[in-house]
Curated annotation (Swiss-Prot):
Extracellular membrane side: 19-715
Compositionally biased residues, Gly residues: 207-223, 686-697
Protein name: Protocadherin-10
Gene responsible for this protein: PCDH10
Any single Gene Ontology cellular-component annotation: postsynaptic membrane
Length: 1040
């Protein structure tokens, strides 16, 4: 019979849990319907499988089974209530079911109803009771209790005895609900009349009240026949004994004792004491357990027969039973002893001896990093078998993890996400749950689970650098590997599988895919064509790395700059002079009367390459065996190195092979043949007048009508004029040098000896005004490091001028530019600075009383440490920088200046290959001497007449270049007698000669030792001085 009782108790604790209650009778057959869980919960049966309807594993029972598709709960095997729940008044089976999506948990209680399937039974089929004949009516004698495994109304209800006149039964109920019978003597016994009485003792249960048990209702068990009442019998034999007048007596009928559980065996429970006033054996009392004590109590307790000591003999467990009833009897040893009875009620005190237990019902193996906070990860329950505070459990989640515990229902908890997860920060978490009770001392249990974080495509690929500069040499092989870009993705799996590509763009009107390609797997870049630096120097494009993530792939970009590196793949092309129309060599005519330095032509070439690959060098490779011609290796100017031999046959032209070579690796070159035809006649003007020895630098083309005598006379006249001018120029130079040396002794050494300030300026007078100051320092030699040229800001309009001739490529130009110098001499230190002054006005002045440049020279001592420049005191920082400048100036210089090792000064010995010696020059200095003669002593004043010439008289004036910027800064300085000046130098005598005089000269070879201040040193020094104004020529010229 099946009884279905649906209490429909739906508990929705935070919307997760519900509870159902069913009843079923024991001993039902397999397949008996218990209830439809899905229907009772109002669930859609068609969606049970999709929502993952299932039972919690640790709540399953073999007695019941659940159809997961229909939600029907039925009996799987027969249920024996007495076997499952023993004597418990309530027998409930628990089943937990849940739905995964969304998570819903339901607790189902199935109460097993008892049926009257067990009759009462006595421990023994024959019971014997001995009663003294002296027993008085009303005396009670407890009988052995019957046992009925059924509970409730089906349990033992009553006892019956065969009707008689001597005895009756009084049924008593124990504290635990069990019933036992006491035999009551109704009238005195007479052993002599009847020594033995036999009756049938019957135990009757409560069956037969109806078809269902307590709380029965409609359902599967309706309509079953009522259950029959069951009985059990035993033969009761009463033996009448001889009388024993006194019965032992206990102090009290009931004793109550409390013991903590887990008390060790041998622990005293109580010391019982019963007294008997009789003497001898009739008064000697012995103790024993009563016949109706439970078997479990016999196992747990022990009683001493002689002393009445009741002690623990087993393990007490509060969780098994909180109370035990121990029945003890005492009787004397006399004949016909009548026992006395008492009850010991043992209450077991709970001890915190059970740690909490954690049981996980469901655990998700992986949770997505994109899961929202509050997502359920695991479900578990916690139980503690102890009671009260010892059974109250608290749970916590260890560690700093983005999860938290959420209490759901009774002792059920869920682990949910507390914050958004990031797999890149942690791809797995070990969650440790600790359950701790409130006992003293508290017990705890921990259990760990592993939760994996599944990846979400939330990271875009990133390149190792945002911009790649890739250098590719031109003329590369198409399809060659040029570079590899790389990107990384913090995701994993398909979300981190990258594919490289190039974004579409146009390069010179064509798609980038015609220039480069990329390997989509490894990011290798390949050139699809051979690059030409002359057509395309650089281009840029973007590469993209895209992952294979879903639902949406992410991408990252980087810029790639392809920089084409030039190769020397273009030979120089000669563009002038051009060959004839029929491919005949270019032709030039050379007057027989041409002077050395005559500009025959300028060879011009171009190179499509760049940098060193396009820097060209010109040379004569063949046809110049007599060294008649020389070629400027930089400009390509072809000039005569000496006069044409008079005996040269005009019909035999010179065939020169000109080579133009670049500086690439390997170098490439081109050649051209130039036919030079000798002609007689007058010389026509030719641009590019000689910077060599020619007087005015202008030569005449020959006149076809002129005769040989006119040419010969003109040559003789020029030779005589050149010799005369050279002699006069040399004589003037010697006189000037002697005068300068004398004035230097007078003006410099004397001033130093008197510790005065020496004022020298190439632009005007005033140099003697400061020499009148009194001397307070010791004499000191003047060294080159004691000279500093400084720029003057207050420049008047009448400086001295020195005209300088500068040679251009196609003519001669004269420029007048004047510079003022300030020579600062320091008597206290040999480290003095050399600085420029501003250029003076180009107008010429003869006023000897006025100082046009405003230049001053002051010596400084310990009391006056600063240098006065432009009317202001120089700072200490400037002094420090001046010391650094002096250090560089005083460094050991290279003997034989490297500047003269370049092919800047040419002579007739040069064949065009740079084989002339240093300082060689065949130039005529006639016109140069004439200019020098006009302005050479324009700086002298009235003081020079009285005291001798000072330094400013012989110091040369620097002349800047014309409006065009020169190709080389060394060509912007002019030294008389030299075609082009590679470097301006300072010459000084060795310091080993104590009597040697120091001078400031620019005339090339007059000193044995000379050194060059390199351009980089000068630029650095001038920058460190922090002058208020930096003229442009300081960055282009060298100084001595």
């Amino acid at each position: 019979m099946i009884v279905l009782l649906l209490f429909a108790l739906l508990w929705m604790v935070e919307g997760v849990f519900s509870q159902l209650h069913y009843t079923v009778q024991e001993e039902q057959e397999h397949g008996t319907f218990v209830g439809n869980i899905a229907e009772d919960l109002g669930l859609d049966i068609t969606k049970l499988s999709a929502r993952g309807f299932q039972t919690v594993p640790n709540s399953r029972t073999p007695y019941l089974d659940l159809n997961l598709e229909t939600g029907v709960l039925y009996v799987n095997e027969k249920i024996d209530r007495e076997q499952i729940c023993k004597q418990s008044p309530s027998c409930v089976l628990h089943l937990e079911v849940f739905l995964e999506n969304p998570l819903e948990l339901f607790q189902v209680e199935i109460e097993v109803l008892d049926i009257n399937d067990n009759p009462p039974s006595f421990p023994e089929p024959d019971l014997t009771v001995e009663i003294s004949e002296s027993a008085t009516p009303g005396t009670r004698f407890p009988l052995e209790s019957a046992f009925d495994p059924d509970v409730g109304t089906n349990s033992l209800r009553d006892y019956e005895i065969t009707p008689n006149s001597y005895f009756s039964l009084d049924v008593q109920t124990q504290g635990d609900g069990n019933r036992f019978a006491e035999l009551v003597l109704e009238k005195p016994l007479d052993r002599e009349q009847q020594a033995v009485h036999r009756y049938v003792l019957t135990a009757v249960d409560g069956g037969g009240g109806g078809g269902v048990g307590e709380g029965g209702g409609g359902g599967g068990g309706a309509g079953l026949p009522p259950q029959q009442q069951r009985t059990g019998t035993a033969l009761l034999t009463i033996r009448v004994l001889d009388s024993n007048d006194n019965v032992p007596a206990f102090d009290q009928p009931v004793y109550t004792v409390s013991l903590p559980e887990n008390s060790p065996p041998g622990t005293l429970v109580i010391q019982l004491n019963a007294t008997d006033p009789d003497e001898g054996q009739n008064g000697e009392v012995v103790y024993s357990f009563s016949s109706h004590i439970s078997p479990r109590a016999r196992e747990l307790f022990g009683l001493s027969p002689r002393t009445g000591r009741l002690e623990v003999s087993g393990e007490l467990d509060y969780e098994e039973s909180p109370v035990y009833q121990v029945y003890v009897q005492a009787k004397d040893l006399g004949p016909n002893a009548v026992p006395a009875h008492c009850k010991v009620l043992v209450r077991v005190l709970d001890a915190n001896d059970n740690a909490p237990e954690i049981s996980f019902s469901t655990v998700k193996e992986a949770v997505s990093e994109g899961a929202a906070p509050g997502t359920v990860v695991a479900l578990f329950s916690v139980t503690d078998r102890d009671s009260e505070e010892n059974g109250q459990v608290q749970c916590e989640l260890l560690g700093d993890v983005p999860f938290r515990l959420k209490s759901s229902f009774k002792n059920y908890y869920t682990i949910v996400t507390e914050a958004p997860l990031d797999r890149e920060a942690g791809d797995s978490y070990t969650l440790t749950v600790v359950a701790r009770d409130r006992g003293e001392p508290a017990l705890s249990t921990s259990k760990s689970i592993q939760v994996q974080v599944s990846d979400v495509n939330d990271n875009a690929p990133r390149f190792s650098q945002p911009v790649y500069d890739v250098y590719v040499t031109e003329n590369n092989v198409p399809g060659a590997y040029i570079y590899a870009v790389s990107a990384t993705d913090r995701d994993e799996g398909a979300n981190a599988q990258l594919a490289y590509s190039i974004l579409e763009c146009q390069i010179q009107g064509m798609s980038v895919f015609t220039y480069v390609s990329i390997n989509s797997e490894n990011g290798y870049l390949y050139a699809l064509r051979s690059f030409d630096y002359e057509q395309l120097k650089d281009f840029s494009f973007q590469v993209e790395a895209r992952d294979a993530g879903s639902p949406q792939a992410l991408a990252g970009n980087a810029t790639v700059n392809i920089l084409i590196v030039d190769q020397n793949d273009n030979a120089p092309a000669i563009v002038a002079p051009l060959p004839g129309r029929n491919g005949t060599p270019a032709r030039e005519v050379l007057p027989r009367s041409a002077e050395p330095g005559y500009l025959l032509t300028r060879v011009a070439a171009v190179d499509a390459d760049d940098g060193e690959n396009a820097r060209l060098t010109y040379s004569i490779v063949r046809g110049n065996e007599m060294n008649l011609f020389r070629m400027d290796w930089r400009t390509g100017e072809l000039r005569t190195a000496r006069r044409v031999p008079a005996k040269r046959d005009p019909q035999r032209p010179y065939e020169l092979v000109i080579e133009v070579r670049d500086h690439g690796q390997p170098p490439l070159s081109s050649t051209a043949t130039l036919v030079v035809q000798l002609v007689d006649g007058a010389v026509e003007p030719q641009g590019g007048g000689g910077s060599g020895g020619g007087g005015s630098g202008e030569h005449q083309r020959p006149s076809r009508s002129g005769g040989g005598e006119t040419s010969l006379d003109l040559t003789l006249i020029l030779i005589i004029a050149l010799g005369s001018v050279s002699f006069i120029f040399l004589l003037a130079m010697i006189v000037l040098a002697v005068r300068c040396q004398k004035e230097k002794k007078l003006n410099i050494y004397t001033c130093l000896a008197s510790d005065c300030c020496l004022c020298c300026c190439c632009c005007g007078g005033g140099g003697s005004t400061c020499c009148g100051r009194q001397a307070r320092a010791r004499k000191k030699k003047l060294s080159k490091s004691d000279i500093m040229l400084v720029q003057s800001s207050n420049v008047p309009s009448n400086p001295a001028q020195v005209p300088i001739e500068e040679s251009g490529g196609f003519g001669s130009h004269h420029h007048n530019q004047n510079y003022c110098y300030q020579v600062c001499l320091t008597p206290e230190s040999a480290k003095t600075d050399l600085m420029f002054l501003k250029p003076c006005s180009p107008s010429r002045s003869t006023d000897t009383e006025h100082n046009p440049c405003g230049a001053i020279v002051t010596g400084y001592t310990d009391q006056q440490p600063d240098i006065i420049s432009n009317g202001s005191i120089l700072s200490n920082e400037t002094k420090h920088q001046r010391a650094e400048l002096s250090y560089l100036v005083d460094r050991p210089r290279r003997v034989n200046s490297s500047a003269f090792q370049e092919a800047d000064i040419v002579s007739s010995k040069d064949s065009g290959h740079g084989d002339s010696e240093q300082g060689d020059s065949d130039h005529d200095a006639t016109n140069r001497a004439q200019s020098a003669g006009m302005d050479l002593f324009s700086n002298c004043t009235e003081e020079c007449k009285a005291l001798g010439h000072s330094d400013r008289c012989w110091m040369p004036s620097f002349v800047p270049s014309d409006g065009r910027q020169a190709a080389d800064y060394r060509s912007n300085l002019h030294v008389p007698g030299m075609d082009s000046v590679p470097d301006t130098e300072v010459f000084e005598t060795p310091e080993a000669q104590p009597g040697a005089e120091r001078s400031f000269s620019t005339f090339g070879k007059e000193k044995a030792l000379h050194s060059t201040l390199e351009r980089k040193e000068l630029d650095g020094l001038l920058t460190n001085t922090r002058a208020p104004y930096k003229p442009p020529y300081l960055t282009r010229k060298r100084i001595c």
